Amino acid sequence: MSFVKRLVQLDVDSTFIQQEAIELLAAKAGVLKEVSKITDAAMRGELDFAQSLLARVELLKGLPEAVFDQVRDEITLTDGASDLVKLLHSQGHVVSLVSGGFVNIMQPIVDELKIDYFKANTLEIVDGLLTGQVLGSIVDRAAKAQALTEFALDAQVDMENTVAIGDGANDLDMMALAGL
């Protein structure tokens, strides 16, 4: 039996990590209740993700950039997540993370775990404060599916040898596109 390289792509919030990063940020801003209502509706597919993300991020306006380190300290990887990445890498597979969450929080974790590919939203910062805006294109349902295709192509993995793992409406397209 010959080796078949696979790409395993995981959602981040409440899948690879146990928390929702936006809710950790919202708690620091004192707007957790408002943000949680919007998050829940978006995860159920009742609200367009991009619109809901922009509404939630707007509520974070004025938070200091230092909040990212504080939130990162509160993040707990899902049990077995780090071991899974190490195992997949040791077997020659490729690991990617995609998130409707934020590069600002996850990048050090991605670097530490040597994740092969990563795509998430970037919160805008001006003069050390969050502006309440997202830079660039929003990582939504379609962007997660597109990332799977792009990462597989770059890693030279056939789509039939991709795996996608997620927990919400935002993950359905990438899961449908994956080979498993």
Predicted regions and their residues:
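C-terminal cap/substrate-recognition subdomain and adjoining C-terminal extension
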Residues: 72-180
